Amino acid sequence: MADHIVVRVFAGPDGGGGNPLGIVEDGRTVPGEARQALAAELGFSETVFVDDPGAGLVDIRTPGAVLPFAGHPLVGLAWWLRRRGRGADVLRPPAGEVPTWQEGETTWIRARAGWAAGRRTRRFASVAEVDALPVPPPGEGWLYAWAWEDEAAGRVRARGFPRRGDGIVEDEATGAAALTLAAELGRDLVVRQGVGSVILTRCHGDGTVDLGGRVIVG
C-alpha cells in the first residue's frame, strides 16, 4: 500500500468526531489506474492525492469515483500541507481554484456552491427526528438531513447519507453538503454533524462560501 497519512477533518472542540481523510502526499507514487483501488482499500469517504504541492494540484477519490470538488479533503489537506511547511494558498482540484487560509485552530477554504452539486438537503422539524433516522434512510442519492438547533444563532444539527453503494452508509462530516445548505439558506452556519463533528460556514454575496473547521492527526 502506498504511503499515506490519516487526519480527521471538522473535529469538535473536545477533539472528538471529525471525518477521516486519507492523504497521499506524493501522488506521483500512485499511477492513475491504481488510485481508485487504493481509495477503495482505505475505505474513507474520500482520499486525496497530491500531484503537485507547489501548484496545489490535487485528485480527490471516493471508494468508487473521482470527485471534481469535496470540502473535507481540501480543508484537511490545506491543514496538513501547512503543518508540513508546504502550504499552498490555493488548492486546485478539477472544479477550480480554492483559496485556503488559517485562523487560529480553524482551517478555511473558499469555494462556489455550484461545485457541490448532487447533494440534496432536507429539513426536518426537530433534532430528534434527524437523530432517529435509520442508516441509511430509504431512497437513492445523496441526502443531507438537517434541523435547526438554534435558528437565531444559525446552529444546525445534520447527518449525511451518500446512498451511492460504495460502503459509506453515513458520512461523519460533509463539507460540500454544509456548503450547499449555507448557500440555500443564505447565512452563516455552525453545523453539528455525525457523532461530534463541527463545520463552520460563511456566505458571501458573490456566490462563494467559506468552509472551515479543526483538523487533527487521525
Model regions and ranges:
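Active-site proximal loop and beta-alpha junction motif in alpha/beta enzyme cores
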Residues: M1-G218
